[in-house]
Design a protein with these regions (language model features):
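Glycine-rich active-site loops that engage anionic ligands at enzyme catalytic sites
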Residues: 2-249
């Protein structure tokens, strides 16, 4: 699959995925237009309130619809889902939700910051500017609870993963792996190049909705200082910090 934009969508297929799920396959490439089509399909399915659907899991170019076969028969769910994917979703008019995520770049929080800048042939200041000037689309969640696979990374910042992955990466670490960037939501092993860290909790099991950002939404990183990092960390720990977001479109 390749990143890219096209004006037309190839035929969408609805496939059987075991005895309690359907897999909707969209055009098999990675692109914002494909992702918008997936998000629009999720929205339509929710609006239909089809009894028996228990979960929907979006990926780069597909949507897994899980259902309870004791509540709705295969023939019925297949018919209704197939009808929905044929509908005009008007994806161009969808709103864009953007989360503002603070990041302390470099230093102890970004041990690979200098390497990424050197690999790109740019200064540290330019690395921060390039990484923090875009809104990144959350194509999907995976690998870990709340781990965001983000698209739109400046090509100059594309950096190979570590040859020897780290045994433990602190929660909140912001990394680059190949053509993608993302945030580690919990302490975990990992092989991405770490350029900074956010004090924000991307995953909080104590909350009713533990995952902060959902697939189809956007993340905008903005640089902060050491003192701001310490202040926000304290506010997060005491439960007095709310991550800012806005809508566009």
């Amino acid at each position: 699959m390749k990143f890219g934009e096209r004006k037309t969508m190839e035929k969408i297929r609805v496939l059987t995925a075991g005895d309690s799920a359907l897999l909707i396959q969209f055009e098999q490439r990675i692109g914002e237009d494909v992702n918008r089509r997936i998000s629009a399909t999720v929205k339509l399915l929710k609006m239909q309130q089809i009894e028996g659907i228990v979960d929907m899991i979006p990926a780069y170019a597909s949507l897994l619809v899980q259902y309870n076969p004791l509540v709705i028969r295969y023939e019925e769910i297949y018919k209704r889902v197939s009808a929905i994917v044929k509908m005009d979703t008007k994806v161009e008019s969808m709103e864009k939700k953007v989360w503002e995520i603070p990041v302390l770049y470099g230093g102890e929080q970004g041990p690979d910051f200098s390497y990424v800048a050197e690999h790109a042939g740019i200064s540290g200041e330019e690395l921060i500017r390039l990484h923090s000037e875009k809104d990144y689309l959350v194509y999907m969640l995976g690998f870990l609870p709340g781990f965001t696979y983000l698209g739109g990374l400046e090509e100059k910042l594309h950096t190979p993963r570590l040859e020897n992955p780290r045994v433990k990466i602190p929660a909140g670490s912001v990394g680059i792996g190949g053509s993608q960037t993302g945030v580690y939501p919990v302490d975990s092993p990992g092989g991405w190049q770490l350029i900074g860290r956010t004090p924000v909790k991307m995953y909080d099991p104590e909350k009713q909705d533990p995952i902060l950002v959902q697939a189809g939404e956007y993340i905008h990183f903005y640089p902060i200082t050491d003192s701001e990092y310490a202040r926000i960390s304290e506010a997060v720990a005491s439960g007095n910090y709310s991550v800012q977001w806005h809508k566009e479109g």
